From Swiss-Prot:
Keywords: Glycoprotein, Glycosyltransferase, Golgi apparatus, Membrane, Signal-anchor, Transferase, Transmembrane, Transmembrane helix. It comes from Caenorhabditis elegans. Its main location: Golgi. Pathway: Protein modification; protein glycosylation. This is Alpha-(1,3)-fucosyltransferase fut-3. Inhibited by Ni(2+) and to a lesser extent by Mn(2+) and Cu(2+). It is found in: Golgi apparatus, Golgi stack membrane. It catalyses: a beta-D-galactosyl-(1->3)-N-acetyl-beta-D-glucosaminyl derivative + GDP-beta-L-fucose = a beta-D-galactosyl-(1->3)-[alpha-L-fucosyl-(1->4)]-N-acetyl-beta-D-glucosaminyl derivative + GDP + H(+). GO terms for cellular component: Golgi cisterna membrane. Optimum temperature is 23 degrees Celsius. Vey low activity at 37 degrees Celsius. The keyword 4Fe-4S does not apply.
Length: 400
């Protein structure tokens, strides 16, 4: 039988079209835009970000993931609207606080400091994720005993957590923000605000007896440079009420060239409102240990006590900065030159808290993360990762 050339071409054309169709379907189903944001600290959890296309299309018809908050948070009930500020995820997860709905929950979150107030679940589904949650340090998180292997994921201030739950924002290089299409937030300071009316360091302190012995370090530093303490720990009664409760008092802080941002407890990645609520203050924050901040704040944006042998050496450097406006201004170049900005709140790649837990649950659905791992001893993990200090550094620094 003779085959006409036209028939051959027709069959070839149909074959090519079929192959193209298969390729197109595969591309749509298997596509992953690799949505992640490289930041100055290469942390595992920040890279594992689900493509919003995949969440929106592949799982769009599936029921939302249910996150059950088993405990309160320092006695307060978690609102059902807790996911309302999770762009792209607001309808992908729901928050529940009804413990009778345990069997329907995909993840169950336990706030560490409240665990003792509620009986632990007596059973769990094989595919259920139990999450250990705390924004505070181990010593301020209750240390209530739970069975070994009880928790699958961690959600703490530590950058090594499965789902980071930190204070403040993510500061990132402006170049990276622009490459991701983020709106750049300016931290520019009017030069006249860098001219100070007061000398030395200002601090607003309410905890007068800390584990790190911050008070001893400041007391000794005050022998070499002016250190003004306001709040409950002020020695001058007039300074005790200098800043009313709930007021940031930026106008007071910016009168001084330096301000105290030392935490009550010095632990890895533990950076609270002492920094974040004053990030716009045109003064240089003083911290205790550089290692805690160097991967969280821009380079040369703060001064650490452990950069100096002793209080005298530190005071000499601070006084030299007071006397040299050019050298002092170098600590604000990240602002003035627009080198750093904030990632948009809960943007992909920078999810925080429950938003990150929700995102991870969808990754688990797509078999892209370790779902069924467990922590043998959650408190041992928390202590080892936190590396909290007592007074060893201050004792050594004072004798240096």
């Amino acid at each position: 039988m003779r085959v006409r050339p036209a028939s051959v071409y027709r069959y070839l054309l149909l074959g090519v079209c079929a192959l193209l169709g298969i390729y197109t379907v595969y591309s749509i189903i298997g596509y992953d835009d690799g949505s992640h944001v490289p930041i100055h600290r290469p942390q595992r959890h920040l890279y594992l970000t689900v493509s919003q296309d995949r969440i929106g299309s592949r799982f769009g018809k599936l029921a939302p993931k249910r996150i059950l908050y088993w405990t309160t948070i320092f006695g307060a009930t978690v609102p059902s609207t807790a996911l309302s500020d999770c762009p792209g995820l607001t309808d992908r997860c729901v928050i529940d606080t009804n413990r009778h709905q345990l069997d329907s929950a995909d993840a169950v979150v336990f706030h560490a400091a409240d665990i003792s107030k509620f009986p632990l679940p007596v059973s769990r589904k094989p595919d259920q994720i139990f999450v250990f949650n705390s924004m505070e340090t181990p010593d301020n998180s209750g240390r209530f005993a739970v069975p070994d292997g009880f928790f699958n994921w961690t959600s703490t201030h530590l950058y090594s957590s499965d789902a980071i739950h930190k204070y403040g924002t993510f500061l990132i290089p402006t170049q990276i923000a622009e490459s991701r299409g983020f709106k750049v937030q300016s931290y520019y300071v009017q030069p006249k605000r860098l001219v100070k009316t007061m000398k030395g360091i200002f601090g607003l302190i309410s905890n007068c007896h800390t584990k790190s012995k911050r008070e001893l370090a400041l007391q000794e530093l005050g022998k070499h440079i002016n250190v003004t303490i306001g709040g409950k720990c002020a020695s001058d009664d007039r300074l005790k009420s200098i800043c009313p409760a709930g007021v940031e008092c930026i106008d007071v802080f910016e009168q001084y060239p330096f301000y105290i941002a030392i935490e009550n407890t010095v632990c890895n990645d533990y950076v609270t409102e002492k920094i974040w609520s004053r990030i716009t203050v045109p003064s240089i924050p003083i911290v205790m240990r550089r290692r805690v901040y160097q991967n969280i704040l821009p380079p040369k944006s703060f001064i650490a006590m452990d950069d100096y042998k002793n209080p005298s050496e530190m005071a000499n450097h601070l006084r030299s900065l007071e006397a040299n406006s050019t050298a002092y201004g170098e600590y604000f170049e990240w602002r003035q030159k627009g080198l750093w900005t904030s990632a948009p709140w809960n943007a992909p790649g920078y999810r925080n808290g429950l938003c990150r837990v929700c995102e991870l649950l969808w990754k688990a659905k797509d078999n892209e993360t370790e779902v069924y791992k467990s922590y043998d001893n959650i408190w041992k993990w928390f202590d080892n990762e936190s590396q909290c200090e007592t007074d060893e550094f201050v004792r050594s620094w004072l004798s240096g």
